[in-house]
A protein has these predicted regions:
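A residue-level marker of the well-folded mature domains of exported/periplasmic proteins
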Residues: 16-312
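Positively charged n-region of N-terminal signal peptides that target proteins for export
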Residues: 1-4, 50
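Bacterial N-terminal signal peptides
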Residues: 5-15
Length: 312
């Protein structure tokens, strides 16, 4: 009986050791990448860049995301669960600039460095909670919106009736793009923003919202969408109204489908970000912080306006 108990205990001990070794991936440090969603090409590209960097730097990358980009509560749960697994660093694209801060308090308490990617934290909420990110990795969304607005003014000769598809109200990324666009066009007396409504980053909502917008304002001749998915939805609404070729569409992200639309002439332009570069820089920054290296508070990723003249 004693021998049997000893054998069982030994087997359990070996099993536990194997489990720990497997979880730690042979002692490699683990970086968690928590994305808004993986049902969007932008974040799929970001994951790809992050994985390439993780493979090159010899760290384990754990990637999780909510089903929908607007599901802040699910993202908060993911963050809390990731921290409990003993990660060494956390890179996150916040679904809610304010809401996510309460989950990041747990990362702070666990001394897990935080790398914020693409969407900034609300500065007041973060300061009030004592949450400080090691760095922000992303493009300047305000400048991107301004780039789109400047293009519209030039392309229309300063005369346009514009409908805007916003992201999620109160969401830093969309708000900054919207502010940049508005600032770019406000000096042109001939440019009028006749409607501006949220479509929550989704293609279906882009279609529905712009279809209703077009019915209410049939004189709209230009649309700025704060993301390409919403822009692609607007293009479908334009086609349904048999107005293809009469309304300029400007998007943001330069997704592959948007580039195809630009080449086909159904979209005028899109502001390109480089999500794979963001993912790469996020993992590189996380590894540097884990090694005690100092990194800049902001790591900027370039922007580029894609039109029919340079689309690839």
């Amino acid at each position: 009986m004693k021998n049997t108990c000893l054998l069982v205990a030994l087997a359990l001990s070996i099993g536990c050791n194997r489990s720990t070794s497997s979880t730690a991936t042979a002692g490699k440090p683990t970086v968690a990448l928590v994305l808004k969603t993986l049902n969007h090409p932008f974040f799929v590209d970001m994951r790809r860049g992050a994985q390439e960097a993780a493979d090159r730097l010899g760290v384990t990358l754990q990637v999780q995301a909510a089903e929908r980009e607007i599901d802040v509560e699910k993202q908060m749960q993911i963050v809390e669960n990731m921290i409990q697994t003993g990660i060494q660093a956390l890179a996150i694209t916040p679904s809610g600039s304010r809401e996510i801060v309460s989950a990041l308090v747990k990362a702070r308490d666990a001394k897990v460095p935080i790398i914020v990617v693409d969407t900034r934290l609300d500065p007041k909420a973060a300061a009030d909670a004592g949450v400080r990110a090691a760095t922000f990795v992303g493009s300047d969304n305000y400048e991107g919106g301004k780039l789109a607005g400047d293009y519209l003014v030039k392309a229309t000769g300063g005369k346009a009736r514009v409908g805007i598809l916003e992201g999620i109200p109160g969401h830093e990324t969309g708000d900054s793009r919207l502010r940049g666009f508005r600032d770019a066009v406000k000096g042109s007396a001939g440019v009028a923003i006749v409607a501006s409504q949220p479509a929550n980053w989704e293609r279906d909502q882009g279609f529905n919202v712009f279809q209703n917008m077009l019915q209410a304002h049939p004189d709209i001749d230009s649309v700025f969408a704060c993301s390409d998915l919403m822009a692609l939805g607007a293009i479908e609404a334009i086609a349904a109204a048999r107005k293809t070729g009469t309304i300029r569409v400007i998007g943001f992200d330069a997704l592959d489908d948007a580039k195809k639309a630009i080449a086909a002439g159904t979209m005028e332009a899109s502001v390109a970000q480089f999500p794979s570069e963001m993912g790469r820089a996020a993992v590189e920054s996380a590894v540097k912080v884990m090694h005690g290296e100092r990194i800049p508070e902001d790591i900027k990723v370039k922007l580029e306006l894609v039109t029919k003249d340079n689309v690839k």
